[in-house]
Amino acid sequence: MAARTVLVLGGGVGGLVTANELRRRLDPADRVVVIERERRHLFQASLLWLMVGRRRRDQIERPLRELLAPGVELVEADVRSIDPAARRVETTAGVFTGDALVVALGAEPDRDAVPGYREVALDFFSPEGAAACAGALHTFGGGRVVVAVAALPYKCPAAPYE
């Protein structure tokens, strides 16, 4: 059988686990290629702990390469377009095609979707946001707190309940 190529788009938890499991299960001749824009992997589930001072940023971040199994290829690039039928991906590093395509790009908050969000709302979906939330919690003297989900999908579905 000819060697196959699997393209994994995204180096978050979903992409990382998928790529590492594929590398473990596939024939050694098959290629597993992760395409990710960030050099470092941020374990986003720990942003809550960062926000409340139970972790430091250096404890929840690692070079992505260190987390990939030996034999998993890494392409540092932004994904520009995806043609799922052709299993073709256009990136800032060129065009890639594969025999299979895994899309694990995650969700990004659209802070402009809700008027006034940028001016008054806080979220902990980034280290900077977690730090801003920590500051607000530290100075909070009581009153009402509104927890809102503006639209689906959103990062970390359990977050509003935590």
PLM regions and their residue ranges:
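Beta1-alpha1 glycine-rich phosphate/pyrophosphate-binding loop at the start
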Residues: 2-73, 150-162
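FAD-binding core/adjacent interface of flavoenzyme oxidoreductases
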Residues: 1-5, 72-161
